[in-house]
Amino acid sequence: MMTTPSTPLYRLEGVGKEYDGPGEELVILKGLDLTIEAGESVAIVGASGSGKSTLLHLLGALDTPTWGKLHFLDRDMGAMSPEEKAAFRNREIGFVFQFHHLLPEFSTVENVAMQAIISGMPHAEAYGLAREALDKVGLSGRVEHKVTTLSGGERQRAAIARAILLRPRVLLADEPTGNLDERTGDVVGRMLLDLNRELGMTLIVVTHNRELADLMGRRLELRAGELYDQHRP
């Protein structure tokens, strides 16, 4: 089936996810029907345990639906092999988490370039892209600094630079401001939106931060694994 300009980036049809629990199966997501368009900025909100992070993991090919269909453009993500999922993540997805997971013994630019080098990219190319990404997040003056000398907000910005290094089509962020103070979190949240607009990448954010959610173009609210509400400002 050919992709057309109107094809959604993501299409979920009756998507559910369950895990084996003690003595019974634990249902986390219950039959989600949803589309996400290329270039959107989307917040996923809801109480703890509502399925937000599970949904993000499905969108990032970190997990597979138990039932239903999940398509990226016209590709069935549920039918991907583990190798295909890994290639898909490397090519299409950038991940940002609450904790930056930067390696303290390396410089900022080394941390940002490292995964590309491990994947086989020549050092010069990887470092060039890393410097460009760090410039995008306002860290051009901190390139050679050890990450231990960076503030919390700067470390999260370095993690964002790492996520956008290869210009993925989608940026998935799980509580990206959850470990930051209010002012720093606002700076990081607005930076994510700036990158969404400037680079044209789809931004999907799981957050408990109401102010951050309200900045997004659309807010999806999950309750007990179901899509309870969709809201556009």
Swiss-Prot record:
- Enzyme class of the recorded protein, top EC level: translocase
**Protein's job:** Part of the ABC transporter complex LolCDE involved in the translocation of mature outer membrane-directed lipoproteins, from the inner membrane to the periplasmic chaperone, LolA. Responsible for the formation of the LolA-lipoprotein complex in an ATP-dependent manner.
Which positions in this protein are listed as binding ATP?
A: G46, A47, S48, G49, S50, G51, K52, S53
Keyword Heme on entry:
no
Principal place of residence = membrane
Query: Subunit structure, briefly?
Result: The complex is composed of two ATP-binding proteins (LolD) and two transmembrane proteins (LolC and LolE).
InterPro entries xref list: AAA+_ATPase (IPR003593), ABC_transporter-like_ATP-bd (IPR003439), ABC_transporter-like_CS (IPR017871), ABC_transpr_LolD-like (IPR015854), MacB-like_ATP-bd (IPR017911), P-loop_NTPase (IPR027417)
Q: In this protein, which residues make up the domain named ABC transporter?
A: 10-233
Gene Ontology CC, one term:
plasma membrane
Protein origin, superkingdom: Bacteria
Residue span of the signal peptide, if any? none
Key words of the record: ATP-binding, Cell inner membrane, Cell membrane, Membrane, Nucleotide-binding, Translocase, Transport
The annotated topology with respect to the bilayer is: Peripheral membrane protein
Note the SUPFAM superfamilies from the entry: P-loop containing nucleoside triphosphate hydrolases
Family per similarity comment: Belongs to the ABC transporter superfamily. Lipoprotein translocase (TC 3.A.1.125) family.
Q: Which CDD domains match?
A: ABC_MJ0796_LolCDE_FtsE (cd03255)
Identify a single GO molecular function assigned to this protein: ATP hydrolysis activity
Provide the E.C. number(s) assigned to this enzyme: 7.6.2.-
GO BP terms: lipoprotein localization to outer membrane; protein localization to outer membrane
Q: Where in the cell is it found?
A: Cell inner membrane
From the Swiss-Prot or TrEMBL record, give the protein name.
Lipoprotein-releasing system ATP-binding protein LolD
